[in-house]
């Protein structure tokens, strides 16, 4: 049966995902940046309360995946922290200036991760040659690749995802970006073994007092009074679709 991973930005969302049938959580901060490394406090609280597998993302900033020496040092430190806290896996990725896997740095990440299952995130979708990249990641023992098939959403990239699946058994190809209940059957019919979804929506802040003329974001038009949360009903619906597909 296909595995359902839910992207979560808080402990509350991780618990919601777990309670509604998620098989695994990708734990992130900063949804507007596409997911950054969670704080130590969030990591510890999730580790204590969530019982399904949780894979934190290790990404020090938004933007591209070619990092300075200081940023890469932080990545390695965060990998070690996640390992010490007892998480079963993590999500990360590094590229060089030419859009290839940064091989020396990826080797260091894998050494720091040790027995943890490593997912190479959507840095894969920014690489220059996906098949060569997949071969490189297989050599390192990367467990899975999260990809939209190098398109803006995974449904548009489904043909590339199928090509990657046909390329070999490892790493596992996990489809993500725009995967929802209404299009999930396309991925299941294509033989995708793991799917990744945020399964959520922006929720209004409970604050009654609002200073509407002020923003804490560099984007002056950002909505400071909303937050992204997992929708338990959406998770349950996706899980039900997967179970019914398996029963066919």
Curated annotation (Swiss-Prot):
GO molecular-function term, one example from the UniProt record: copper ion binding
Predominant place of localization: cytoplasm
Short name of one Pfam family: CutC
InterPro entries assigned: CutC-like, CutC-like_dom_sf
Record keywords: Cytoplasm
Localization annotation: Cytoplasm
Disulfide pattern: none
Domain of life: Bacteria
Gene Ontology cellular-component terms listed: cytoplasm
Family: Belongs to the CutC family.
Quaternary structure and partners: Homodimer.
UniProt protein name: PF03932 family protein CutC
The organism of origin for this protein: Escherichia coli O17:K52:H18 (strain UMN026 / ExPEC)
